[in-house]
A protein has these predicted regions:
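Outer-membrane beta-barrel translocator/receptor signature
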Residues: 205-207, 218-289, 295-303, 311-314, ...
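C-terminal beta-signal and adjacent terminal beta-strands/loops
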Residues: 540, 596-599, 603, 697-704, ...
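Short, acidic, small-residue-rich periplasmic hinge/interaction motif at the N-terminus
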Residues: 37-43, 51-53, 82-86, 97-140, ...
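N-terminal periplasmic accessory domains that precede
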Residues: 100-105, 138, 147-150, 167-170, ...
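Outer membrane beta-barrel strand-and-loop segments of large Gram-negative receptors
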Residues: 415-427, 562-568, 574, 583, ...
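Flexible loop and strand-edge segments within Gram-negative outer membrane beta-barrel domains
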Residues: 283, 289, 294-296, 300, ...
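Gram-negative outer-membrane beta-barrel transporters
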Residues: 593-596, 608, 615-701
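Short acidic/polar hinge/loop motifs at secondary-structure boundaries
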Residues: 70, 149, 187-215
C-alpha cells in the first residue's frame, strides 16, 4: 500500500503545480458548419434517429445516419450522441472537426459496467470521480431484485443483508447511513429508520445507476462518507417522433416469482416530452438449497411519471413516483424462549419438522412500506457561460410493522412510522472557457418523522424534526490530458427528538451540528489508454435518531436494538485512487483506498436477550470507536476475439479499531469473480445471441472478532456458478425487437452462508434460482 501511495500522489501534486502555473487560453474558434455521419462500430451500418445535442439545441440523424451541425458553434461546445442500446459519446466541436472523415463510431452496450466520465452539462458524474455506472440493458437483467443486489457486481461494492430480500450496498466497507442514495436527484430518506430494510427503490424505474466511491460530501452533503449511489432516469425524448416504449414479463423458480413492467414515452415537437413507467412483482416462500424459508413472500407495486418542457433557454420537468411493498418476516427468526433461540443459532437452520409447504400467503409478522416522491426541476441557460438549476421535492415514507399479538390485535401495527421531507436546491454552473468551470450551490431540507398513535406499543424511535442547510463551491480545471477539481462546503443541521420510554418518562433532546468539508481530486492521461484518477476528501454525518434512541425490535434482522444517546458525529478522511488501462483487447483497473473514521458507529451483541409476545430476540447495542479501513480492488477484461471476453475481478478490505487493532464487524471477506462471455450477430446481423458463465469465490472471513458476533466462528468459504443466455430477435417491426433472457443463479444448488448476511444465524442463503424474461421494445 505504501508503494501505491508513493507512486500515485506525485501525479496529483504535478497536476496541482500545473494549475498554479496557469495556462494560455486561446480565443474560441467558430465552426463553419459540420457534416457528421454516425455508424455502428461493429457492423459499420448507419444509425438513423441518433439523438444529437449541442448547446441548448438538438436534432436527430437522418436515414443515412447523417446530421449537419449548424454554423456558429464555439469550438469548445460539447456535442453528445445518444442512442438506445449504445454507449453515449460526447465530443467538442474542435475534436469533431479533427475526427477522421467526420465519422462517429457508436459502440453497442455489451458490458455490464461502464466507466464514469464527464459527458454533457448536468451530468451527475465527474471525470475526477472514481466510480462506475450500470446501464439500462444491464438493469433489465435484474428484474425482481433490489438495489443492493443490482450493484454488488461493481468493483469495491458488496452487500450486507438481513434475510432473503432486505439488503443494502456496501462501498469500501461503508454501509447503511454512510452511503447516500439519490433517487432521481432527491436524497432517499427512509433509511433514517434504521439498517434493517432495503431502500424502497424499484429497479424497473431506473434508467441508469451510478456508484461514486469517494468521500462526496462537498457535492452531496452529509452522509456521503463511503460514497454515493445515484438512481436516475434517461433524458426525456424531446426529439423522438412517435410513441416508443417496452414491456417485460419475467419469472423465477425460487419463490415462484412473477412480474411485469412497462414503459411508454413520447416527444412532442422538440419542446414537450413525457414518460410513464409501471411495475408489479409477486413472490412466495423462498428456498435454500435444502429447505424452504417460510413467510418470505413479497409484493411490490411501483409507478413513475415524467413531463418535461423546454425552449431555447428555459426547461422544466415534473416527476412523480410511488412504490408500495409488502414483505413477510422469516418465521425462523422468531423463537419462543431463550433456550430455543440459542439452540436455533447453534443449529444455524430450522428443524425439518417446523417447515411447512410452500405458500404465497404472507402471514404475521410482516411489514408494509410506501415511498412517494414529487419533484419539480427547472433550468435556465442564458448563454454558453452560465446555467442555473433549481429543484424542489417532497417525499412521503410510510412503514407499518405487524406481529402476532394477543387479544386479536395482530391486525394493528406495532410500529407505524410516517416520514415527510421537503428538499430544495439551487445550482449555478459557470464555464469561463474550455478549461475552467465553477459550480456552486445551496441546499435546504426539512424532515418531520412521527409515530402514529394507537399501536398499543412504545415506539422504537421517538418523533423528531430535522432541518439542514448546505452551501458549496467546486472549481474544475481540465485539459485533454489532465485536470484537477477543488471543492469546499459548509453544512448545518438541527435535530429535535421527543419520545416516551417504557417507564412513561420523556426522552430526547436537541442536537446542533455545523461542519466544514473539502475535497481535491485530479486525473491524468499518463499514456495512450492509461488514466490515473485520485481524490482526497473529508466527510461527516451526525448520528441518526435510530442510532441515538432506538429501543425496540428490528424485525428484519430478528434482533432487539438499544440506542446510545451519547453518540458523536462520525468524521471521515478518505483517499481513493484508480489506475485504468484501455486498448482494443485489454481493459484493466486497479483501485486503492484509505479511510480514517473518527467516532465510527457500529452494532454489537450484548449477550443478553429480550422476550416479547412475538418471540425472544438477541439484544444489540450501539457503540462507537475510531476506525481505519483500507483496501484494494482490481479487475481485468481480455478480448481475445471480437465476440469473446473474459473478466476476473477481486477485492480485499482491512478494517480495524485504531486504538486496539480489533477487527470491525460485518466487513466483506476476500472475493473473486470470473466471467467468460460470448456474443454473436446471427442471420446476417439481424439477430444477436449471447451466453456467459460466471464463477464467484468468497473466502472465509478470518479477520473476525467473536466478541462482536452471536457465534464464535465465521461461515466457511464457498464457490457459486451462474449462467446467462440471451437472444435478441430483430426485424419484428421498424425499430422494434424482442429480447429473451435466461439466467441461473447458484447453478449447482450450493448450500452456503454469507458472512455479511445477518440472517445466517437462523438459515442458509438462497439455493438455485432460474430466471426467465421476455422484453418487447418498440
Amino acid at each position: 500500500m505504501n508503494l501505491i501511495i508513493r507512486r500515485i500522489i506525485p501525479f496529483l501534486l504535478i497536476a496541482l503545480a500545473m494549475v498554479n502555473g496557469g495556462a494560455n487560453i486561446s480565443a474560441q474558434e467558430r465552426s463553419k458548419g459540420l457534416l457528421i455521419r454516425v455508424i455502428d462500430d461493429e457492423t459499420l451500418q448507419p444509425l438513423p434517429g441518433v439523438l444529437v445535442h449541442y448547446g441548448r439545441e438538438g436534432n436527430v440523424t437522418n436515414e443515412e445516419g447523417n446530421i449537419d451541425l449548424p454554423q456558429g458553434l464555439a469550438a469548445n461546445t460539447t456535442v453528445s450522441f445518444s442512442y438506445i442500446g449504445y454507449q453515449k459519446i460526447s465530443l467538442s466541436i474542435d475534436k469533431l472537426r479533427r475526427s477522421k472523415g467526420g465519422v462517429i463510431h457508436m459502440t453497442p452496450i455489451t458490458e455490464a459496467l461502464e466507466e464514469v466520465v464527464v459527458t454533457t452539462e448536468g451530468n451527475t458524474t465527474r471525470r475526477t470521480a472514481v466510480g462506475q455506472s450500470i446501464g439500462a440493458l444491464t438493469l433489465g437483467m435484474q428484474m425482481g431484485k433490489n438495489l443492493g443486489e443490482a450493484v454488488q457486481g461493481v468493483r469495491g461494492v458488496s452487500l450486507i443483508s438481513n434475510g432473503v430480500s432486505s439488503s443494502q450496498p456496501v462501498i469500501h466497507g461503508m454501509y447503511g447511513e454512510r452511503i447516500l442514495i439519490l433517487n432521481n436527484g432527491v436524497r432517499h430518506k427512509s433509511q433514517q429508520w434504521g439498517q434493517g430494510h432495503a431502500p424502497e427503490i424499484a429497479l424497473a424505474q431506473a434508467g441508469r445507476v451510478t456508484i461514486l466511491k469517494g468521500a462526496e460530501s462537498v457535492r452531496y452533503g452529509a452522509d456521503a462518507l463511503g460514497g454515493v449511489i445515484i438512481v436516475e432516469q434517461a433524458s426525456l425524448p424531446y426529439s423522438q417522433e412517435g410513441i416508443k416504449g417496452s414491456t417485460t414479463l419475467y419469472g423465477a423458480t425460487n419463490g415462484l416469482t412473477y412480474g411485469v413492467s412497462g414503459k411508454v414515452e413520447k416527444g412532442m415537437g422538440h419542446h414537450l416530452a413525457w414518460r410513464v413507467l409501471g411495475d408489479y412483482s409477486n413472490s412466495g416462500d423462498k428456498r435454500t438449497a435444502q429447505y424452504l424459508l417460510n413467510n418470505t413472500g413479497q409484493r411490490q407495486w411501483s409507478m413513475l411519471g415524467q413531463l418535461g418542457w423546454r425552449s431555447t433557454a428555459l426547461e422544466a420537468e415534473l416527476l412523480i413516483s410511488s412504490l408500495q411493498e409488502k414483505e413477510g418476516t422469516y418465521f425462523g427468526a422468531q423463537m419462543g424462549n431463550v433456550d430455543l433461540l440459542k439452540e436455533r443459532i447453534e443449529m444455524g437452520r430450522p428443524p425439518q419438522d417446523v417447515i411447512t409447504p410452500f405458500t404465497r400467503k404472507i402471514d404475521y409478522g410482516y411489514h408494509t412500506t410506501s415511498h412517494s416522491l414529487a419533484k419539480l426541476k427547472m433550468g435556465y441557460t442564458p448563454n454558453n457561460r452560465h446555467r442555473f438549476e433549481g429543484m424542489i421535492a417532497y417525499q412521503l415514507n410510510l412503514r407499518n410493522e405487524y406481529h402476532l399479538r394477543r387479544n386479536k390485535l395482530s391486525h394493528v401495527p406495532e410500529s407505524a412510522l410516517v416520514l415527510q421531507n421537503v428538499e430544495g436546491e439551487f445550482l449555478w454552473h459557470y464555464t469561463a472557457n474550455k478549461h475552467l468551470e465553477v459550480e456552486s450551490g445551496i441546499l435546504g431540507t426539512f424532515t418531520d418523522n412521527y409515530n402514529k398513535p394507537g399501536t398499543g406499543v412504545v415506539p422504537m424511535i421517538p418523533n423528531y424534526v430535522q432541518g439542514g442547510w448546505g452551501v458549496y463551491t467546486i472549481t474544475k480545471y481540465h485539459t485533454d490530458m489532465w485536470g484537477v477539481e477543488i471543492g469546499i462546503r459548509g453544512d448545518g443541521q438541527r435535530t429535535e427528538a421527543v419520545g416516551i420510554d417504557y417507564d412513561g418518562q420523556n426522552y430526547g433532546g436537541i442536537e446542533h451540528q455545523n461542519n466544514l468539508t473539502y475535497s481535491i481530486g485530479g486525473y491524468a492521461e499518463i499514456a495512450n489508454g492509461l488514466t490515473l484518477r485520485s481524490q482526497i476528501g473529508s466527510a461527516w454525518r451526525a448520528p441518526h435518531v435510530s442510532e441515538l434512541y432506538s429501543n425496540g425490535l428490528d424485525m428484519e434482522r430478528g434482533i432487539y436494538m438499544i440506542g446510545n444517546k451519547d453518540l458523536k458525529s462520525e468524521r471521515v478522511f478518505k483517499w481513493v485512487a484508480s489506475l485504468s488501462y484501455r486498448n482494443s483487447w485489454l481493459h484493466a483497473d486497479l483501485e486503492g483506498y484509505l479511510q480514517w473514521v473518527n467516532n465510527y458507529i457500529y452494532q454489537e451483541p450484548t449477550k443478553a436477550y429480550r422476550t416479547l409476545v412475538s418471540g425472544t430476540y438477541p439484544l444489540f447495542a450501539i457503540k462507537q470507536t475510531s476506525a481505519a479501513l483500507h483496501g484494494v480492488d482490481a479487475e481485468v477484461t481480455v478480448y481475445p476475439f471480437s465476440w469473446l471476453s473474459y473478466t476476473i475481478s477481486s477485492g480485499m478490505i482491512w478494517a480495524n479499531e485504531q486504538s486496539t487493532g480489533r477487527y470491525l464487524p460485518y466487513m466483506p471477506p476476500l472475493h473473486i469473480r470470473e466471467e467468460i462471455k460470448g456474443e454473436w450477430a446471427v442471420l446476417g446481423g439481424k439477430h444477436k445471441a449471447s451466453i456467459s458463465l460466471q464463477h464467484k469465490f468468497v473466502a472465509k472471513q478470518n479477520r473476525f472478532d467473536p466478541d462482536t458476533d452471536l457465534i464464535k466462528f465465521a461461515p466457511p468459504a464457498y464457490h457459486l456458478v451462474g449462467l446467462n443466455v440471451g437472444f435478441t430477435q430483430g426485424g419484428i417491426a421498424k425499430n422494434s425487437d424482442i429480447i429473451y433472457r435466461l439466467s441461473i443463479e447458484n447453478l449447482f444448488n450450493k448450500e452456503y452462508k454469507e458472512y455479511t448476511n445477518l440472517a445466517r444465524y437462523y438459515a442458509h442463503d438462497l439455493g438455485r434460482n432460474i430466471q426467465f424474461s421476455i422484453s418487447y421494445n418498440f
